[in-house]
């Protein structure tokens, strides 16, 4: 049953309640007469009880339907259970999205920290490499200086034996 049918069913129940009340009123009128007919009073009373029983069963049916709807139990012609499942699915999706967003933020924080640490390590490695290059250059300069000094000593030592003259001439040749 669709919602429109449910509304029509409730309208019918309302009409039966009105008939039930009219039957009760007619039965009371019959009993209130000075010359009341017991047969008419019984007929009206039976009609009242019959319509009351019908109203009670139809109202119970509607109450059962509303109980099913309100507790989310599946029932004929209702989209409530499907709507509830859909709503819960949307809720789960929203929760999953927020959790993914949190994880992405955490990842971004950690990857940023990792990039900074990697940058510091690279800078440190570059500084060490530069320092090693400077040390190598200093060692090369020292080796070159030592080689130059050794060469000067070797060339300077050979000149010292030939005389004190800066030109390297022989002192015995200078006397006449």
From Swiss-Prot:
Membrane-traversing stretches: none
UniProt main location, coarse: nucleus
MF terms in GO: transcription coactivator activity; transcription coregulator activity
Biased composition (Basic and acidic residues): 99-108
UniProt-listed Gene3D superfamilies: 1.10.287.3490
Region ranges (Disordered): 98-176
Annotated InterPro entries: Mediator_Med11 (IPR019404)
Subcellular location: Nucleus
Biological processes, Gene Ontology terms: regulation of transcription by RNA polymerase II
Key words, A-Z: Activator, Nucleus, Transcription, Transcription regulation
GO CC annotations, alphabetized: mediator complex; nucleus
Compositional bias segments (type: Low complexity): 124-154
Quaternary structure annotation from Swiss-Prot or TrEMBL: Component of the Mediator complex, which may include CDK8, MED4, MED6, MED11, MED14, MED17, MED18, MED20, MED21, MED22, MED27, MED28, MED30 and MED31.
Protein family membership: Belongs to the Mediator complex subunit 11 family.
Protein role: Component of the Mediator complex, a coactivator involved in the regulated transcription of nearly all RNA polymerase II-dependent genes. Mediator functions as a bridge to convey information from gene-specific regulatory proteins to the basal RNA polymerase II transcription machinery. Mediator is recruited to promoters by direct interactions with regulatory proteins and serves as a scaffold for the assembly of a functional pre-initiation complex with RNA polymerase II and the general transcription factors.
Protein name, UniProt field: Mediator of RNA polymerase II transcription subunit 11
Annotated organism of origin: Drosophila melanogaster
């Amino acid at each position: 049953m669709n919602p429109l049918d449910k509304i029509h069913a409730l309208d019918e129940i309302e009409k039966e309640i009105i008939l039930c009340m009219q039957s009760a009123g007619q039965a009371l009128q019959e009993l209130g007469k000075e010359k009341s007919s017991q047969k008419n009073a019984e007929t009206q009373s039976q009609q009242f009880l019959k319509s009351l029983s019908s109203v009670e069963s139809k109202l119970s049916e509607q109450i059962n339907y509303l109980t099913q709807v309100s507790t989310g139990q599946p029932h004929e012609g209702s989209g409530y259970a499907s709507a509830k499942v859909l709503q819960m699915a949307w809720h789960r999706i929203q929760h999953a999205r927020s959790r993914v967003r949190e994880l992405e933020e955490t990842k971004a924080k950690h990857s940023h920290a990792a990039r900074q640490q990697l940058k510091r390590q690279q800078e440190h490695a570059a500084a060490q490499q530069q320092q090693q290059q400077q040390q190598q250059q200093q060692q090369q300069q020292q080796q070159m200086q030592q080689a130059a000094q050794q060469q000067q000593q070797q060339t300077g030592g050979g000149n010292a034996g030939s005389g004190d003259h800066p030109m390297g001439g022989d002192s015995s040749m200078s006397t006449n």
